[in-house]
UniProtKB/Swiss-Prot annotation:
Residue pairs linked by disulfide bridges in the UniProt entry: none
Gene3D superfamilies recorded: 2.30.30.50
Function: Stabilizes the interaction between PsaC and the PSI core, assists the docking of the ferredoxin to PSI and interacts with ferredoxin-NADP oxidoreductase.
Similarity remark: Belongs to the PsaE family.
Protein's name in the database: Photosystem I reaction center subunit IV
Keyword flag Lipoprotein: no
Database matches in InterPro entries: Elect_transpt_acc-like_dom_sf, PSI_PsaE
């Protein structure tokens, strides 16, 4: 299950970041077509480093790291 902070691989062939890794910045729950915002290290030709994707266009590579428990 993709969640905020997950490392994901992009499966959309027409995307600049096809087969690249990115980090999930947020997930919109309102029912839009491309609810997952993914942030990347490198920028595209327009200088943008984020893009929206559908859940089925992403494969989770690494789950987000757990936060340490508060004392």
């Amino acid at each position: 299950m993709v969640q905020r902070g997950s490392k994901v691989r992009i499966l959309r062939p027409e995307s600049y970041w096809f087969q690249d890794l990115g980090t999930v910045a947020s997930i919109d729950q309102s029912g839009i077509k491309y609810p997952v915002i993914v942030r990347f290290e490198k920028v595209n030709y327009s200088g943008i480093n984020t893009n929206n994707f559908a859940q089925d266009e992403l494969v989770e590579v690494e789950a987000p790291k757990a936060k340490p428990a508060k004392k």
